[in-house]
Design a protein with these regions (language model features):
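Acidic glycine-/aspartate-rich tracts in secreted/extracellular proteins
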Residues: 52-57, 110-114
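Short, exposed beta-strand-loop hairpins at the edges of beta-sheets
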Residues: 107-121
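Short, low-complexity cationic-aromatic patches
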Residues: 32-46, 90-103
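N-terminal Sec signal peptide cleavage junction
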Residues: 24-25
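Bacterial N-terminal signal peptides that target proteins for export
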Residues: 2-15
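A low-complexity, Ser/Thr/Gly/Pro-enriched, surface-exposed linker/loop concept
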Residues: 60-87, 124-129
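Short N-proximal segments of mature Sec-exported proteins
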Residues: 44-52, 58, 66
Length: 131
């Protein structure tokens, strides 16, 4: 205990508690997707898809390069934290991507407005993502 400045101990405790509470808030993230009309949509309102060739729970995406140019991944920031049915996979380029129930999530470049689902069933391997 600091006998010269007793209020310093109280100030130190308050500062430590504040830092702990604020630090916890910084790591909280809202869900990376929303449900609209029974399908998952990204923060921009656009439909999200899963790729049948991605193995659920593998921790990676097999849609890279030209595939990812047509099916852009729903990217996660390095500071994002997964919770619930959401997880984060690491792409071949080292960047992070959101996944739902272990399946990486993607947009389709030919969807032009929220509510479009033109990629559903594409090549019989792309499906709208559902909760």
């Amino acid at each position: 205990m600091n006998f010269v400045f007793p209020s310093l101990n109280r100030l130190t405790a308050v500062a430590a508690l504040s830092a702990a509470l604020l630090g916890g808030c910084a790591s909280m993230a809202s869900a990376p997707a929303m449900v609209s009309n029974g399908v998952l949509t990204g923060p921009n309102g656009m439909t999200l898809y899963t790729f049948d060739k991605d193995a659920a729970g593998s921790g990676k995406s097999v849609c890279n390069g030209p595939c990812a140019a047509n099916w852009p991944p729903l990217m996660a920031a390095d500071t994002d934290k997964a919770s619930g049915d959401y997880s984060i996979v690491t792409r071949d380029d080292g960047k992070k991507q959101w996944a739902m129930k272990g399946k990486p999530l993607y947009y389709w470049v030919k969807d032009t407005k929220p509510g479009d689902m033109t990629g559903d069933g594409f090549n019989k391997v792309w499906q709208v993502a559902k909760p």
